[in-house]
């Protein structure tokens, strides 16, 4: 696509970050000087945890966080997505009621076994209402309030170690 001057249209081709280098700085001294150490990406750190799976909690296409949770499409708990290799290792099958837990709590969800998720990772949408849960907790209960994702101190919905097993009746 070209503009009125015949040149290719490139979004933001003349806008540059307000950093000393004029480039995106993933580890910025200028941000650290202005906002403190929280502005600098942390160095890699080992995560020693007894929970082998990493829970990611993406946004739902049925809600805006928890807003609109009372609509018909949101009145049930979202499934837990798991890779077939992880399901087989735990003797779990598609449709099983599973328990997802860590030191912060536990949630019961219906398992959806799918190749759409990587081994070692499980996923369930954030924002479900408490009324959808038999334990009175949703996936957000497993997310640490102590870990901060960014300068705005957002929650780490994609950095939550958990384990999954068959729910006992």
Language model segments and positions:
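Long, contiguous, secondary-structure-rich segments that constitute the structural scaffold
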Residues: 65-80, 85-169
């Amino acid at each position: 696509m070209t503009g009125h001057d015949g040149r290719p249209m490139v979004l933001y081709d003349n806008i540059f970050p307000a950093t000393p280098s004029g480039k995106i700085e993933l580890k910025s001294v200028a941000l650290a000087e202005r906002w403190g150490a929280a502005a600098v990406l942390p160095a890699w750190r080992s995560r020693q945890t007894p929970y082998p799976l990493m829970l990611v909690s993406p946004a739902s296409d049925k809600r805006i966080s928890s807003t609109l949770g009372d609509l018909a499409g949101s009145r049930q708990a979202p499934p837990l997505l798991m890779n077939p290799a992880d399901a087989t290792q735990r003797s779990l099958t598609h449709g099983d009621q599973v328990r997802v837990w860590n030191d912060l709590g536990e949630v019961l969800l219906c398992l959806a076994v799918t190749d759409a998720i990587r081994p070692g990772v499980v996923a369930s949408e954030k924002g479900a209402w408490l009324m959808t849960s038999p334990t009175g907790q949703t996936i957000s209960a497993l997310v640490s309030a102590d870990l901060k994702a960014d300068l705005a101190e957002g929650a780490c919905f994609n950095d939550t170690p958990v384990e999954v097993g068959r729910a006992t009746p």
